[in-house]
């Protein structure tokens, strides 16, 4: 019987685990970088999937020894055996790098949740990036979603969950057909707060580069303001899900541009 959970897959021999997890690498990514057969290439396709654990981290590199993977994914099981995406990142290795993930001394920032490299964050924001991005993305989220849904289906599931780390992530997931398990009212309240007369709009006082008034009408700049602490609390308690092959048609930010 084929395993249906991350914990089940992690009990398999390593070659089988690699083959199963490699299914959610989008073909378009492999073709873009002309990657070789990856399941046996341990330097380009790296995993952390200890036997007995219920999570897996995958890194796909376009060349051996490069600083950042072109694809990073961290998956885990929910309490009832569903697949939960904790983090999914696509990096363009040819784009400039911004060290928002580490301090000048090399210590990690955990994407700005532990500490912040403000100089790198400001440079990233000016270059059009959103919070958490060290490089521009690859614009492959649509085929990546399709490949991931094929992987989910192969495990016998018809839905999966995601944890948006930032405000803009949640909005992007909305646009790709996700619905909210929890946090929709929070997202709607944030949108309302940025409207004319709203409390959050009033806090966009130009006191620092992350709080410019123009952020009120931009998903990306709102996300930077939220990352900067404009909510007076972390952006948490938002969980989303998607049913394979369907779109929930949810929007908590009507009329707001990227």
Located regions from the model:
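Residue-identity detector for threonine
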Residues: 5, 39, 67, 76-78, ...
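Arginine residue identity/basic-tract feature
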Residues: 18, 23, 27, 48, ...
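Long, acidic/serine-threonine-rich intrinsically disordered regions with weak helical/coil propensity
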Residues: 1-106
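Acyl-donor binding region in acyl/amide transferases
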Residues: 81-177, 181, 186, 190-194
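Intrinsically disordered, low-complexity, charge-dense segments enriched in Lys/Arg
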Residues: 2, 7, 11, 188-258
